[in-house]
């Protein structure tokens, strides 16, 4: 695979943007020009370059809107939203940086201006969560000429460790709408604006979060918008793949698509550390103080490690690397949890992932679905960047759309004419 950046981390995040080109999330020329302004490994240059490109895309959107070019305005606003999202992404080592919230709000604002121009109906919602706390949700409905017979099948889409609801559009609604599916996406605690504004931290019992969302969808949204609750699937990618499996125990979910999720997040992190060091910490021989000192030293020379622990502390609401690992120990599908899943399930893996390799994740998750008949579970391992081999199917979103909706069509008995 050709690399734009020598750093695997920077290259992956660049491909994350470039991979949205088919769905108006980026323009090839804009991305290549922006890449030329970024110093590999330097988050400040990354921020400035994508901020500048976001402003340019937003200006194009406003120019198009001023002359009534609905399509041009829609596409440019959606690109701007994605560039704004990318600009603040590598600043997460310092969550109090005001540029994070400013860029996040700019991303949401640009996306809200873009979706009203889509060939679809889109509605924003506030989902009751706890006490007076509400979570942002968004319903995408297919245009009349894309509707399937009967009520509308719907995909409930959850984010993951570092996504935002606006980015989820490219993974879900962009492929669902032309196929006649509705999508209901949301940002939960530890994600998007609930993290940045509400300071809500990610919950490891994600099934609780999804139960609140499902209450709202089934009671308030589905009746008004003709959603088919007998054809309701959940979908998540990367850590979202894990979160979707946590939620799949709810009987209201009729199918689950878990894209490249982990079996046990702590065990994956553990495998990347010297055995004597991590085992020493687990046994108490290495104290928290020593562990934190070593990790902090590594973050000074390795930006990827700095970002992973910095973002982890922010999302989990903890102060030290040792505490990050303690939260990770709770992010696991071991101990019989997979046996509770009764709905048809599609598990995907990424052969070339540098995070969640299939041998210790997708393959074991698939085998753990013991309550399902062979015909009710399916495993797909993507290979190569063009075939879904990178984590979360980066660079192959059209491929994952094809695989996912072909499987959902079969699961929900949706018949289409052969072309």
Curated annotation (Swiss-Prot):
Disruption phenotype: Accumulates 20-hydroxy-prefusarin. It is an enzyme of class 3 (hydrolase). The active site is at residue 238. InterPro entries: AB_hydrolase_fold (IPR029058), FrsA-like (IPR010520), FrsA_esterase (IPR050261). GO terms for molecular function: hydrolase activity. Pfam families: FrsA-like. It comes from the Eukaryota. Its EC number is 3.7.1.-. Keywords: Hydrolase. The keyword Hydrolase applies. Pathway: Mycotoxin biosynthesis. Induction: Expressed under high amounts of nitrogen via regulation by GLN1. Moreover, components of the fungal-specific velvet complex VEL1, VEL2 and LAE1 act also as positive regulators of expression. Finally, expression is induced under acidic conditions in a PACC-independent manner. 20-hydroxy-prefusarin hydrolase; part of the gene cluster that mediates the biosynthesis of the mycotoxin fusarin C. Within the cluster, FUS1, FUS2, FUS8 and FUS9 are sufficient for fusarin production. The roles of the other FUS members are yet undetermined. The fusarin C synthetase FUS1 is responsible for the condensation of one acetyl-coenzyme A (CoA) unit with six malonyl-CoA units and the amide linkage of the arising heptaketide and homoserine, subsequently releasing the first intermediate, prefusarin, as an alcohol with an open ring structure. PANTHER family: ALPHA_BETA HYDROLASE PSOB, DIENELACTONE HYDROLASE DOMAIN-CONTAINING PROTEIN-RELATED. Belongs to the AB hydrolase superfamily. FUS2 hydrolase family. This is 20-hydroxy-prefusarin hydrolase FUS2. The lineage of its organism: Eukaryota, Fungi, Dikarya, Ascomycota, Pezizomycotina.
């Amino acid at each position: 695979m050709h690399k734009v950046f020598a750093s695997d981390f920077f290259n992956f995040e660049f491909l994350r943007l470039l991979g949205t080109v088919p769905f108006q999330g980026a323009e090839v020329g804009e991305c290549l020009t922006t890449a030329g302004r970024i110093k590999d490994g330097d988050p400040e240059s990354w921020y400035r370059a994508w901020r500048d490109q976001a402003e340019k895309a937003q200006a194009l959107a406003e120019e198009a809107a001023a002359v009534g070019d609905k399509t041009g305005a829609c596409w440019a606003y959606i690109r701007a939203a994605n560039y704004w999202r990318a600009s603040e992404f590598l600043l997460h080592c310092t969550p109090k940086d005001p540029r994070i919230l400013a860029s996040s709000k700019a991303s949401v604002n640009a996306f809200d201006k873009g979706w009203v121009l889509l060939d679809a109906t889109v509605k924003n919602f506030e989902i009751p969560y706890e006490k007076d706390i509400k979570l942002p949700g968004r319903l995408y409905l297919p245009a009349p000429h894309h509707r399937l017979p009967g009520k509308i099948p719907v995909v409930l889409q959850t984010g993951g460790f570092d996504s935002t609801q606006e980015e989820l559009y490219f993974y879900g609604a962009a492929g669902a709408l032309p196929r006649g599916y509705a999508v209901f996406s949301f940002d939960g605690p530890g994600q998007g604006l609930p993290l940045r504004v509400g300071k809500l931290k990610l919950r490891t019992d994600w099934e609780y979060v999804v139960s609140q969302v499902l209450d709202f969808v089934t009671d308030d949204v589905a009746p008004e918008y003709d959603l088919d609750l007998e054809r309701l699937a959940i979908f998540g990618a990367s850590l979202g793949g894990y979160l979707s499996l946590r939620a799949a125990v709810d009987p209201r979910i009729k199918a689950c698509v878990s894209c490249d999720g982990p079996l046990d997040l702590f065990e994956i992190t553990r495998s990347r550390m010297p055995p004597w060091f991590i085992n020493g910490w687990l046994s108490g021989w290495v104290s928290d103080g020593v562990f934190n000192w070593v990790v902090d030293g590594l973050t000074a020379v390795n930006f990827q490690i700095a970002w992973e622990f910095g973002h982890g502390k922010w999302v989990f609401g903890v102060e030290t690397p040792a505490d990050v690992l303690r939260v990770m120990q709770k992010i696991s599908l071991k101990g019989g949890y997979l046996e509770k899943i009764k709905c048809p399930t599609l598990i995907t893996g990424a052969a070339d992932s540098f995070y969640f390799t299939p041998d210790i994740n997708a393959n074991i998750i698939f085998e753990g679905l013991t309550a399902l008949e062979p015909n009710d579970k399916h495993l797909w391992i993507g290979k190569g960047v063009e075939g879904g081999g990178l984590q979360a199917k980066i660079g192959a979103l059209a491929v994952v759309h094809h695989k996912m909706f072909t499987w959902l069509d079969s699961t929900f008995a949706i018949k289409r004419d052969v072309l």
